[in-house]
């Protein structure tokens, strides 16, 4: 889910709204936000976001938040995910859907989806959103990340074939998501030891920094320092605590 958060946030323009969306995504993925109707209403009225970005976010929320089976599909998401009404996009979307149906892993689905255009990918999301077809949640997330990568690429004006993610926007967002996750883990580790106050301090500073960077918008390379500082602080803290946690490398 960290990966999904990273890709989705990389297509949201920097500003206070980005920090707010990041918070909503975090809550949704942590199972804290269970009112899909209210969430969609909130999303629909957000300024600045393009219809497609709203459509993708709406799709993510719908996949993640448990809801009653009969809940109405939202028109603003359907309109955004119709591939501009282009029948070619629809044809390609159906072909892609058939492949995704056989693919159950996130990375497999993402790999397949990356060879399609953003229009076909959006149409394919529309198919799934409108319940015309069903794929595993993993596959759907792979499709979402591939779409965001295509969009971030065109925003970045880089059309070279991307095998690994070289896009600075996505790397930057990934560092910020990692920093938030690390901060959260530090707070959980802190417990009641005397170093707890220090850990909480470092974690809350990191949180504030990430929020500020999202709200103000910074150069993608600026987040490298943030991640390094955080990891250094975390490792120093772990040494003193006598804990070695591998997952933050």
Curated annotation (Swiss-Prot):
Residue ranges annotated as motif Nuclear localization signal: 98-102
Swiss-Prot/TrEMBL keywords: Host nucleus, Membrane, RNA-binding, Viral matrix protein, Virion
Gene3D superfamilies in the record: 1.10.10.180, 1.20.91.10
Domain of life according to the entry: Viruses
Membrane topology listed for this record: Peripheral membrane protein
GO molecular function: RNA binding; structural constituent of virion
Disulfide bond positions: none
UniProt-annotated location(s): Virion membrane; Host nucleus
Residue span of region RNP-binding: 162-249
Sequence segments annotated as region (Membrane-binding): 1-161
A Pfam family: Flu_M1_C
A Gene Ontology cellular-component term: virion membrane
Quaternary structure, from the entry: Homodimer and homomultimer. Interacts with NEP. Binds ribonucleocapsid by both interacting with genomic RNA and NP protein. May interact with HA and NA. Cannot bind NP without genomic RNA.
Other facts noted in the record for this chain: Most abundant protein in virion. When expressed alone can form virus-like particles in transfected cells.
Function: Plays critical roles in virus replication, from virus entry and uncoating to assembly and budding of the virus particle. M1 binding to ribonucleocapsids (RNPs) in nucleus seems to inhibit viral transcription. Interaction of viral NEP with M1-RNP is thought to promote nuclear export of the complex, which is targeted to the virion assembly site at the apical plasma membrane in polarized epithelial cells. Interactions with NA and HA may bring M1, a non-raft-associated protein, into lipid rafts. Forms a continuous shell on the inner side of the lipid bilayer in virion, where it binds the RNP. Determines the virion's shape: spherical or filamentous. Clinical isolates of influenza are characterized by the presence of significant proportion of filamentous virions, whereas after multiple passage on eggs or cell culture, virions have only spherical morphology. Filamentous virions are thought to be important to infect neighboring cells, and spherical virions more suited to spread through aerosol between hosts organisms.
Entry similarity comment: Belongs to the influenza viruses Matrix protein M1 family.
Protein name per Swiss-Prot or TrEMBL: Matrix protein 1
């Amino acid at each position: 889910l960290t990966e999904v958060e990273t890709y989705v946030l990389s297509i949201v323009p920097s500003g206070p709204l980005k920090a707010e969306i990041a918070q909503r995504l975090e809550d949704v993925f942590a199972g804290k936000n269970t009112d899909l109707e209210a969430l969609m209403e909130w999303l629909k009225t957000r300024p600045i976001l393009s219809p497609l970005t709203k459509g993708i976010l709406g799709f993510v929320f719908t996949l993640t938040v448990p809801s009653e089976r009969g809940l109405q599909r939202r028109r603003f998401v359907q309109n955004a995910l119709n591939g501009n009404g282009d029948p070619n996009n629809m044809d390609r979307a159906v072909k892609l859907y058939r492949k995704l149906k056989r693919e159950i892993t996130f990375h497999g689905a993402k790999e397949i989806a990356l060879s399609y255009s953003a229009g076909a990918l959006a149409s394919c999301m529309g198919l799934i959103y409108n319940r015309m077809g069903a794929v595993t949640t993993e596959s759907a997330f792979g499709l979402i990340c591939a779409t965001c990568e295509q969009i971030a690429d065109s925003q970045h004006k880089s059309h070279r074939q991307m095998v690994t993610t070289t896009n600075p926007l996505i790397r930057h967002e990934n560092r910020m998501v990692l920093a938030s996750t690390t901060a959260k883990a530090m707070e959980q580790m802190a417990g009641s030891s005397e170093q707890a106050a220090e850990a909480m301090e470092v974690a809350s500073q990191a949180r504030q920094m990430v929020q500020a960077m999202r709200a103000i918008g910074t150069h993608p390379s600026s987040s490298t320092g943030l991640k390094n500082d955080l990891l250094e602080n975390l490792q120093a803290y772990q040494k003193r605590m006598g804990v070695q946690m591998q997952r933050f490398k």
